[in-house]
């Protein structure tokens, strides 16, 4: 195991679930289901909960809906888990305001995505994140790099320059490569807590310095994901690898099409009335739902 996995801070624990946003039959946010789901996820091993991220369908939620959801989840779990709010935007002014509101609402941290669509250069990205950090200096920030959705990527050297902001404490690596984790660790040192942003890469990323995962799969496989991470940290590589191998078919099914379409279907299969995604996303096809159900059943048998 890498020293970074044990020496780096874990400001939000090891397993952070990127929560879905439940909708009722009318398409409105269902705060009651969200609260119940939040408590369930903590019982299943989540140290932290992220509301209104990619999985939470933030692009189709109003800021008022996002704030209500944050408050409902915060009230539901109390001090039993860290609660992060997705406050990113491709408008710096909007991201600053959302982050300040999240801090005032009692969030334990904010996930701030690289600005999407307008593709700022590195100096623009640095100024963007610095403005957010300075606007809410007491709120720990997790920078979020997901170039497949945003169209641009923040460089490790840019992140390193931002480390003089005391509240830039963590990074969600969702570029799909372990190389990003290595580059960040070398550029920023062990004080930056790097989280895998890809369920299937959690174990490989732990091996090169990540401290945990911001997970989608933990909605339905929280205990197994937690056990994999703990086995690795305890030096039991064989058990960690066996759990990784057992989880991969589920992860493939959960990302067979655009997230969060499959995970909402998985929750419905487990009896959670979270509703379909808001348009322009859609429900999971019957064929994919059968494959997903089979993958969930196979994991239960391991």
UniProtKB/Swiss-Prot annotation:
Protein's name according to its UniProt entry: 4-hydroxy-tetrahydrodipicolinate synthase
Substrates-to-products reaction catalysed: L-aspartate 4-semialdehyde + pyruvate = (2S,4S)-4-hydroxy-2,3,4,5-tetrahydrodipicolinate + H2O + H(+)
Site (Part of a proton relay during catalysis): 54, 117
Keyword annotations from UniProtKB, A to Z: Amino-acid biosynthesis, Cytoplasm, Diaminopimelate biosynthesis, Lyase, Lysine biosynthesis, Schiff base
Catalytic residues as annotated in Swiss-Prot or TrEMBL: 144 (proton donor/acceptor), 172 (schiff-base intermediate with substrate)
Protein localization: Cytoplasm
GO CC terms, sorted: cytosol
EC number: 4.3.3.7
Short name of any one Pfam family annotated for the protein: DHDPS
Job of this protein: Catalyzes the condensation of (S)-aspartate-beta-semialdehyde [(S)-ASA] and pyruvate to 4-hydroxy-tetrahydrodipicolinate (HTPA).
Pathway: Amino-acid biosynthesis; L-lysine biosynthesis via DAP pathway; (S)-tetrahydrodipicolinate from L-aspartate: step 3/4
Native source species: Synechococcus sp. (strain CC9605)
Gene coding for it: dapA
GO term, biological process aspect, one: lysine biosynthetic process via diaminopimelate
Family: Belongs to the DapA family.
Subunit structure: Homotetramer; dimer of dimers.
InterPro entries: Aldolase_TIM, DapA, DapA-like, Schiff_base-form_aldolases_AS, Schiff_base-form_aldolases_CS
């Amino acid at each position: 195991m890498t020293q970074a996995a044990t020496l780096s801070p874990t400001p939000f624990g090891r397993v952070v679930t990127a929560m879905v946003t439940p909708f009722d039959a009318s398409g409105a946010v269902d705060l009651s289901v969200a609260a119940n789901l939040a408590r369930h996820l903590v019982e299943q091993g989540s140290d932290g909960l992220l509301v209104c991220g990619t999985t939470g369908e933030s692009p189709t939620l109003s800021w008022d809906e996002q704030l209500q959801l944050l408050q409902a989840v915060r009230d539901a779990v109390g001090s039993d888990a860290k609660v992060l709010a997705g406050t990113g935007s491709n408008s710096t002014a909007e991201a600053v305001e959302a982050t300040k509101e999240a801090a005032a609402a009692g969030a334990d941290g904010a996930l701030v995505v690289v600005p999407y669509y307008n593709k700022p250069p590195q100096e623009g990205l640095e100024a963007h994140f610095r403005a957010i950090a300075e606007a809410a200096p007491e709120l720990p920030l997790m920078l979020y790099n997901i170039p497949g959705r945003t169209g641009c990527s923040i460089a490790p050297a840019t992140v390193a320059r931002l480390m003089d902001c005391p509240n830039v404490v963590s990074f969600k690596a969702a570029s799909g490569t372990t190389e990003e984790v290595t580059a960040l660790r070398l550029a920023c040192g062990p004080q930056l807590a790097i989280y895998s942003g890809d369920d299937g890469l959690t174990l490989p990323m732990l091996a090169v310095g990540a401290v945990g995962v911001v997970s989608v799969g933990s909605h339905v496989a929280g205990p197994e994901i937690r056990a994999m991470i703990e086995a690795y940290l305890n030096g039991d590589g064989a058990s960690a690898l066996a759990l990784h191998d057992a989880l991969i078919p589920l992860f493939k099914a959960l990302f067979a099409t655009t997230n969060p379409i499959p995970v909402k279907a998985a929750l419905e299969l487990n009896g959670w009335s979270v509703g379909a995604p808001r348009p322009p996303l859609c429900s999971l096809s019957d064929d994919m739902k059968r494959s997903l159900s089979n993958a969930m059943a196979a994991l239960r048998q391991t």
